[in-house]
Amino acid sequence: MTKSLPKDFIFGGATAAYQAEGATHTDGKGPVAWDKYLEDNYWYTAEPASDFYHKYPVDLKLAEEYGVNGIRISIAWSRIFPTGYGEVNPKGVEFYHNLFAECHKRHVEPFVTLHHFDTPEALHSNGDFLNRENIEHFVNYAAFCFEEFPEVRYWTTFNEIGPIGDGQYLVGKFPPGIQYDLAKVFQSHHNMMVSHARAVKLYKDKGYKGEIGVVHALPTKYPYDPENPADVRAAELEDIIHNKFILDATYLGHYSDVTLAGVNHILKVNGGQLDLRDEDFAALEAAKDLNDFLGINYYMSDWMRDFDGETEIIHNGKGEKGSSKYQIKGVGRRESPTHIPKTDWDWIIYPQGLYDQIMRIKKDYPNYKKIYITENGLGYKDEFVDNTVYDDARIDYVKQHLEVLSDAIVDGANVKGYFIWSLMDVFSWSNGYEKRYGLFYVDFETQERYPKKSAHWYKKLAETQMIE
């Protein structure tokens, strides 16, 4: 039976400033840590990416033509405050006013993120969110944007607090490239959640008319053998690192006893301690019921086995299937069931995980209000033929995830929209330009856009709300 989605559903496309804009030093933009980090460590840079800084009218026209009625955009903090605070860059402010005006002209609702992996370099090199001064700088930046851009009706504080801590201090594939420091992972999560809470409280206290929330990446964690208590424990601990710690901060305003016990175990085994203050919990408590929505980014699930060896993580950045490895001392080891498909980058394709994660939010955090799926999509080595890409695998991936999303709505979850990652092809942080996600193919040499087969499919979906 063909499943459907509600009439008022947002069929969106997602982007991010650093991955799409290019123009990394144009019109007074300040540096971000990624600029030098990519030059030093990778075979690509974010220049010109998809040149969204100049091409946004083209992309928004395509969005309108293909039924995309919402777009995720992030503001580059260092375009507004080149050093993260102090002097405002008027050309950066003007760019975003023009961009939001074009969104509204094209009837594409902008959902605007304040921070998408791109802390200004001056603050990043001073500890990023491990430095509590950064909390103040972020809240001040948020306050400026809320006041300056009243045309924005949907605000998100952060994109993926979890993968920031994970990428910067556990896997080490994001600047500053530190590995296996679990205390820094949790401290980064915590300080960013305090920043989120304070920005949300400020937005509500000022009486602004829009909505505000946060976007979390929530990969579902399963025990490899559900009958083995040690595997169950490994999945629970892995879930605390990536999901539960952050969700508790968002919706409980504190960390549950189970969460804290897990964190304490992980730190006892791996070393380090956390700085959690009374005023932090006052801020979290004050904001826990003020989130208007939760954005869920979901691409994959993981299966965990019991493991008692040393930590070792190998990141598969080049799409060489089977080259990744992930095991954490005192937590567990990822091992994927052989019957479940995975991408060339070892991302496990499991739509049921999205359903389970949505229902988990509904059950464990009943004050969630509503959910948007803010990222979901298939990274692929697209073949460009006949001025298009016949991306049936991408269509199939999105279709399967929309079907379980429809099931979740039927089962009582309040899900109001879906944003495919990504609207057009963009640069991928630790994979470069080979891994494409877009509805629209970008020739990175000429910056021409070409609709893929998936764009035509998505248009029909948006027009009919039928998942076919």
From Swiss-Prot:
<keyword id="KW-0378">Hydrolase</keyword>
<dbReference type="GO" id="GO:0033920">
    <property type="term" value="F:6-phospho-beta-galactosidase activity"/>
</dbReference>
<feature type="binding site">
    <location>
        <position position="435"/>
    </location>
    <ligand>
        <name>D-galactose 6-phosphate</name>
    </ligand>
</feature>
<dbReference type="InterPro" id="IPR001360">
    <property type="entry name" value="Glyco_hydro_1"/>
</dbReference>
<feature type="active site" description="Nucleophile">
    <location>
        <position position="375"/>
    </location>
</feature>
<feature type="binding site">
    <location>
        <position position="116"/>
    </location>
    <ligand>
        <name>D-galactose 6-phosphate</name>
    </ligand>
</feature>
<dbReference type="GO" id="GO:0019512">
    <property type="term" value="P:lactose catabolic process via tagatose-6-phosphate"/>
</dbReference>
<dbReference type="Pfam" id="PF00232">
    <property type="entry name" value="Glyco_hydro_1"/>
</dbReference>
<feature type="binding site">
    <location>
        <position position="159"/>
    </location>
    <ligand>
        <name>D-galactose 6-phosphate</name>
    </ligand>
</feature>
<dbReference type="InterPro" id="IPR018120">
    <property type="entry name" value="Glyco_hydro_1_AS"/>
</dbReference>
<keyword id="KW-0326">Glycosidase</keyword>
<dbReference type="InterPro" id="IPR033132">
    <property type="entry name" value="Glyco_hydro_1_N_CS"/>
</dbReference>
<dbReference type="GO" id="GO:0008422">
    <property type="term" value="F:beta-glucosidase activity"/>
</dbReference>
<feature type="active site" description="Proton donor">
    <location>
        <position position="160"/>
    </location>
</feature>
<protein>
    <recommendedName>
        <fullName>6-phospho-beta-galactosidase</fullName>
        <ecNumber>3.2.1.85</ecNumber>
    </recommendedName>
</protein>
<comment type="similarity">
    <text>Belongs to the glycosyl hydrolase 1 family.</text>
</comment>
<dbReference type="InterPro" id="IPR005928">
    <property type="entry name" value="6P-beta-galactosidase"/>
</dbReference>
<comment type="pathway">
    <text>Carbohydrate metabolism; lactose degradation; D-galactose 6-phosphate and beta-D-glucose from lactose 6-phosphate: step 1/1.</text>
</comment>
<dbReference type="InterPro" id="IPR017853">
    <property type="entry name" value="Glycoside_hydrolase_SF"/>
</dbReference>
<dbReference type="GO" id="GO:0005829">
    <property type="term" value="C:cytosol"/>
</dbReference>
<feature type="binding site">
    <location>
        <position position="429"/>
    </location>
    <ligand>
        <name>D-galactose 6-phosphate</name>
    </ligand>
</feature>
<feature type="binding site">
    <location>
        <position position="160"/>
    </location>
    <ligand>
        <name>D-galactose 6-phosphate</name>
    </ligand>
</feature>
<feature type="binding site">
    <location>
        <position position="428"/>
    </location>
    <ligand>
        <name>D-galactose 6-phosphate</name>
    </ligand>
</feature>
<feature type="binding site">
    <location>
        <position position="437"/>
    </location>
    <ligand>
        <name>D-galactose 6-phosphate</name>
    </ligand>
</feature>
<feature type="binding site">
    <location>
        <position position="19"/>
    </location>
    <ligand>
        <name>D-galactose 6-phosphate</name>
    </ligand>
</feature>
<feature type="binding site">
    <location>
        <position position="297"/>
    </location>
    <ligand>
        <name>D-galactose 6-phosphate</name>
    </ligand>
</feature>
